[in-house]
């Protein structure tokens, strides 16, 4: 009976697709209603959990929906989990799905059948919001006419007007406004619909909102829609604000024009130094437009990363830098920081771009100063810096490749310390993740940071080998050991359980190809030596219970120089106390798993010479499957587990 129930449910599920023929009926020997109204637990590999009605609404299968509504007692408001625009939406009803997919006829059928028109998803998204997102004016009008709440908000207090404004659906915005949508409502972040329209550059939407009484409110970062438009380089939108003198004071206009010009001077896509200077000049002229009421700049303290640049404060000073692009760049970075503030997440991007340009020009030191400052800003605001850290590793590898002697430990060690701090921060986020958090994203970032850390340690070992050529003293060495010990003490690992030592001896680990490929090749004896010296365990196991020795002899790079490196690492591991008879989850020792005969012979020789009575006893217990859990001192349990295929310990 259970198998028959499953098969019939499956047939009804599949019949919801367009062109399916099963909609006409079902097995008469079983009550069809059971298969139509069953809970939405038909889980799919992609994360969806759907009823036949929801699937039919998703696919626009009008005939199937009509059959269900007219012949069966279906639950119209059954909540399902659906994939919409690449994301899983939890608690979506058939009406929400039909509205979001743009199936007007099905929307009408469901509403007429009694579907709750304001039934929200788990994130408090209504069917009207889904229709506004897609810009389906016909569905929006129908839902409003049938009682949809135009001012309904989601969990972030973001209403339907905001999403329509962000997406640039001009006619939908006008319809919402005409039906009572409040133009000046604010989301939890303080943003209004005008912020979203200005950010996206939708001039027609901005004008519609202004015509319906929208004002320039500040969000939680103190940014108005005018500043939002300026920071995103939407000149036409900013001019629309300026053309309405009741919206902005003269000083507010000046500030917005300065931000527009400063952003043009340091934007990756729309960089235009002439436009930048033009807007800065226009702003300065406005400051002095009334000789009796000059609007002075509120100049901030200088920033070392910007060459301690002091902003120009009058027209002669601005004229003096017209032909000096570097001065315009530094002026603009200082202006952006003054206007946006250090807590604004948009501030670092221009700094990173300017640093990248300097690196391309071979001005590596200035690049490092800017990038270090950008990382500090992001870490201060709890923003992930995994890409920034990788970018630094790439830069250091480039410097070593281009001008070998201009990189020192004073440059690399602070970045390595920041990498360690970022990994620690990520580990805390993953451990304390709330139900609505995204731990998989943090785990991906952690994986990247672990690999970047290894790149940096590898670069440090390269520099340390040139000790005679550099001023590398005991203080540098102690700084290195201190940071590496923190990595090890915090048990830094990839998602699959590999420690830094595992990664350091992995000969087939993918290496970033942007300069680091040439510099950071593995396995690396020097890197492994530093890790072991700082306390990395040679018997630590990953999720497949492979020790670093297993990884060394199975993840093999067959080039001749790498094989010699592997032999040195093998000897290092033996001296550090590696257990040669430790088995992985497949029951293999390093010797039995080894892919290179020359290394296998070495392993067998060492195994014969170094196997202890303690190891033999552990292997005997494992071979005979004797129960030892709780019967011996706890420190011995892990030792026996190392020699056993069965996983006994948690």
Curated annotation (Swiss-Prot):
User: What is the annotated tissue distribution of the protein whose record heads this document?
Assistant: Primarily detected in the embryonic central nervous system.
Superkingdom of the source species: Eukaryota
Mention any Pfam family matching this sequence.
Answer: Ank
The keyword Repeat is assigned to this record: yes
Q: Which GO terms describe its biological process?
A: proteasome-mediated ubiquitin-dependent protein catabolic process; protein ubiquitination; regulation of ubiquitin-protein transferase activity
The pathway this protein participates in, as annotated, is:
Protein modification; protein ubiquitination
UniProt GO molecular function: ubiquitin-like ligase-substrate adaptor activity
Which controlled-vocabulary keywords does the entry list? ANK repeat, Repeat, Ubl conjugation pathway
Q: Which GO terms describe its cellular component?
A: ubiquitin ligase complex
Its transmembrane ranges are none
ANK repeat coordinates: 48-80, 90-122, 123-155, 156-188, 189-221, 222-244, 496-543
Q: How does it assemble?
A: Component of a CRL2 E3 ubiquitin-protein ligase complex, also named ECS (Elongin BC-CUL2/5-SOCS-box protein) complex.
Function as written in the Swiss-Prot or TrEMBL entry: Substrate-recognition component of a Cul2-RING (CRL2) E3 ubiquitin-protein ligase complex of the DesCEND (destruction via C-end degrons) pathway, which recognizes a C-degron located at the extreme C terminus of target proteins, leading to their ubiquitination and degradation. The C-degron recognized by the DesCEND pathway is usually a motif of less than ten residues and can be present in full-length proteins, truncated proteins or proteolytically cleaved forms.
The UniProt similarity line reads:
Belongs to the fem-1 family.
**Name the UniProt record assigns to this protein:** Protein fem-1 homolog B
* Source species of the chain: Drosophila melanogaster (Fruit fly)
Query: What is the taxonomic lineage of the source species?
Result: Eukaryota, Metazoa, Ecdysozoa, Arthropoda, Hexapoda
């Amino acid at each position: 009976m259970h198998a028959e129930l499953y098969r019939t449910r499956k047939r009804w599920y599949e019949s919801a697709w367009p062109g399916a023929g099963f909609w006409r009926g079902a097995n008469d020997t079983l009550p069809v209603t059971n298969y139509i109204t069953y809970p939405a637990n038909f889980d799919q590999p992609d994360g969806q959990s759907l009823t036949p009605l929801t699937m039919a609404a998703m696919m626009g299968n009008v005939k199937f929906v009509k059959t269900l509504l007219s012949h069966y007692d279906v639950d119209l408001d059954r909540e399902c989990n659906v994939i919409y625009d690449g994301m899983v939406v939890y608690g979506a009803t058939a009406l929400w799905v039909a509205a979001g997919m743009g199936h007007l006829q099905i929307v009408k059928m469901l509403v007429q059948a009694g579907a709750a028109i304001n039934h929200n998803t788990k994130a408090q998204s209504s069917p009207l919001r889904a229709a506004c997102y897609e810009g389906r004016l016909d569905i929006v009008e129908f839902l409003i006419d049938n009682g949809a709440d135009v001012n309904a908000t989601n969990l972030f207090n973001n209403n339907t007007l905001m999403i329509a404004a962000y997406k640039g659906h001009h006619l939908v915005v006008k319809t919402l406004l005409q039906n009572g949508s409040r133009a000046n409502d604010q989301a939890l972040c303080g943003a209004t619909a005008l912020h979203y329209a200005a950010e996206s550059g939708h001039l027609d939407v901005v004008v519609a909102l202004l015509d319906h009484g929208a004002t320039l409110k500040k969000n939680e970062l103190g940014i108005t829609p005018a500043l939002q438009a300026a920071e995103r380089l939407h000149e036409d939108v900013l001019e629309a604000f300026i053309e309405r003198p009741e919206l902005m004071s003269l000083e507010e206009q000046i500030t917005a024009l300065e931000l527009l010009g400063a952003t043009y001077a340091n934007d990756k896509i729309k960089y235009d130094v002439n436009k930048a200077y033009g807007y800065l000049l226009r702003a300065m002229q406005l400051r002095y437009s009334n000789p009796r009421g000059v609007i002075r700049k509120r100049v901030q303290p200088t920033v070392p990363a910007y060459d301690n640049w002091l902003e120009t404060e009058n027209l002669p000073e601005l004229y003096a830098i017209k032909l000096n692009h570097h001065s315009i760049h530094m002026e603009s970075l200082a202006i952006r920081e003054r206007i946006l503030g250090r807590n604004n997440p948009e501030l670092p991007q221009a700094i990173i771009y300017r640093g990248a340009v300097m690196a391309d020009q071979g001005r590596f030191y200035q690049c490092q100063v800017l990038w270090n400052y950008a990382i500090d800003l992001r870490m201060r605001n709890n923003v992930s810096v995994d890409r920034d850290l990788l970018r630094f590793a790439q830069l250091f590898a480039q410097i070593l490749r281009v001008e070998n002697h201009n990189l020192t430990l004073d440059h690399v060690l602070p970045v390595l310390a920041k990498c360690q701090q970022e990994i620690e921060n990520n580990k805390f986020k993953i451990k304390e993740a709330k139900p609505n958090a995204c731990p998989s994203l943090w785990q991906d970032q952690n994986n990247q940071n672990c690999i970047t850390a290894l790149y940096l340690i590898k670069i440090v070992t390269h520099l340390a080998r040139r000790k005679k050529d550099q001023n590398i003293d005991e203080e540098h060495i102690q700084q290195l050991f201190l940071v590496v010990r923190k990595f090890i003490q915090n048990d830094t690992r990839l998602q699959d359980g590999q420690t830094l030592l595992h990664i350091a001896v992995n000969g087939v680990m993918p290496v970033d190809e942007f300069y680091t490929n040439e510099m950071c090749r593995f396995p690396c004896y020097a890197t492994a030596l530093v890790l072991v010296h700082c306390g990395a365990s040679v018997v630590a196991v990953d999720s497949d219970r492979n020790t670093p020795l297993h990884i060394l002899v199975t993840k093999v790079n067959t080039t001749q120089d790498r094989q010699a490196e592997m032999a040195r690492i093998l000897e290092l591991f033996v001296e550090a106390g590696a257990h040669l008879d430790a088995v992985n989850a497949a029951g293999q020792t390093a010797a039995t798993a080894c892919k290179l005969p020359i290394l296998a012979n070495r392993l067998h020789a060492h195994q014969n010479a170094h196997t202890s009575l303690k190891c033999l006893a552990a292997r005997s217990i494992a071979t005979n499957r004797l129960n030892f859990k709780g019967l011996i001192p706890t420190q011995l349990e892990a030792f026996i587990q190392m020699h056993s295929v069965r996983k006994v310990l948690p």
